[in-house]
Structure formats: structure tokens, C-alpha cells
Amino acid sequence: MANLCEMDLHVVSKKEEAIIAVKDAFTFNEDEGICAGRIYDSYVYEEGFNKETGEYYAYIMADVAWSVRSAILDKGILQKLIEKYNLDLEIYSEEPGCGFMEHFRWEGGEQIENEVADFALIHLDDMEDEDLRDEFFNMTIVKKYPITIDNYESFADEEGYIKLGGFDYDWVIN
């Protein structure tokens, strides 16, 4: 089984059919629509119509194999939809097992963002496991921070996660 990459996608269009096409591309039934790539789980967690802008939108979360680039973008189906409908579309992904995040963005069908960043994520409960703790401290990104076995708890957020590097989910496409 491949490492799973968690992805969050936001798409906006004046055409409802464009939003439906993107949602269909992330379904598991290839007989009913095209499949965007190696997707193990996906769901639309918000969708609607913005009366102020006259645009339809959808937010989709999914687990994909390895990375968005290898599981979806290399297949080319999503790009064809982006170009066909001149979509505004943005994707963030996290793959903490391999230590990276991705950020892709298109406006009017043109790609304007294509970024990858080192990323580490661990929960305080997992730091009690010596193997997981050692793996975390041996990640390249972790070595760039003043985090040690004595102070790691101070790096945790209110939910107990330590996140180093990566991107903030700062949606540009609204």
C-alpha cells in the first residue's frame, strides 16, 4: 500500500457543470464519470453558489497515493477540466509520512502556483513511542528547528500536534 497523501481542493466557476465535472472526477465509479487519479477516499465537504460573485464552488477532501502530483496531476485529467472550463482551482496536500506538503493553484485555467515544502507532523502521544520519536527527530526539516527531547512539548498546538515547516492553508481562491 502506498503512503497516503491528504489533499484539500477548492474549485470555483461561473458554470455549475464545471463544478459537477470536477466532483465527478473524484468519485470512485469510473463508469459514471472520469476518474482524476489514484484516489482512495474523497468527499465534498462544502459546495454551493455565491450570490455576490455569481460563482459555484466546491471543497473536496481526498486521500491519494503518494502525492497529488503523482496520483492526480501526472494523469492529466484534472488539468483537462481546468483548461476546458477555465477554472480557478487550488490544492493543498500533506504527506507527513514522507515529510512534504504541496500547493498548486490555477486561475482562469492557467497554473500560477506549483510549490513543495518540507513538512513534519507528530502528535505528543506519538512522542512516547521511541521509534516514532527517533524518526521524527531524524527528519531533515526537524533539524532546522531548535526542538529537542527536552523542549518538544512547547512546540505543540492546543490539540497536541507539533507541525514544522510546510504551508498554512491560506486559500487565495475565495
What are these regions (language model features)?
Residues 36-174:
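Charged interaction segments
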Residues 1-27, 173-174:
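Short, extreme N-terminal segment that most often corresponds to the first beta-strand
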Residues 23-30, 140-141, 156:
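Generic secondary-structure transition motif, activating predominantly at the C-termini of alpha-helices
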